[in-house]
From Swiss-Prot:
It comes from Klebsiella pneumoniae. It catalyses: [(1->4)-alpha-D-glucosyl](n) + phosphate = [(1->4)-alpha-D-glucosyl](n-1) + alpha-D-glucose 1-phosphate. Its EC number is 2.4.1.1. Belongs to the glycogen phosphorylase family. Phosphorylase is an important allosteric enzyme in carbohydrate metabolism. Enzymes from different sources differ in their regulatory mechanisms and in their natural substrates. However, all known phosphorylases share catalytic and structural properties. GO terms for molecular function: 1,4-alpha-oligoglucan phosphorylase activity. This is Maltodextrin phosphorylase. Its cofactor is pyridoxal 5'-phosphate. Coiled coil: none annotated. It comes from the Bacteria.
Length: 108
């Protein structure tokens, strides 16, 4: 599976749209919870803009969903798996926001 690319300019634009959606004049006005919501929304926007890989013809697969346990927080792991953790962290550092602290806002 190929690595999904991170676009810094698109992330910055998506982040700006998120804090403007809150009715704020600048990102510096956001609370920690608003930062969490803004980053989550921006990441969702970036991922939904990624092209969907086409399945190989004739290829079959099985999807299995288990409700046996709750797996907890996933954003940090997903950023690591995408190879985006450091880039997102760097972008947030420009706003004096620590990604590790921000990930604590995620609800279990």
């Amino acid at each position: 599976m190929s690595q999904t690319s991170f676009n810094k300019a698109q992330f910055q634009a998506a982040l700006t749209r998120q804090w403007q959606h809150f009715g704020l004049q600048s990102a510096s006005e956001m609370t920690q919870r608003q930062w969490w919501r803004a980053v989550s929304g921006a990441l969702s926007e970036l991922l939904s803009a990624q092209p969907v890989a086409k399945a190989t013809e004739g290829e079959r697969h099985v999807n299995y969903i288990s409700m046996e346990f709750l797996i907890g927080r996933l954003t940090g792991n997903n950023l690591l798996n995408l190879g985006w953790y450091q880039q997102v962290s760097d972008e947030l550092q420009a706003h004096d926001v620590n990604l590790t602290d921000l990930l604590e806002e995620e609800i279990d």
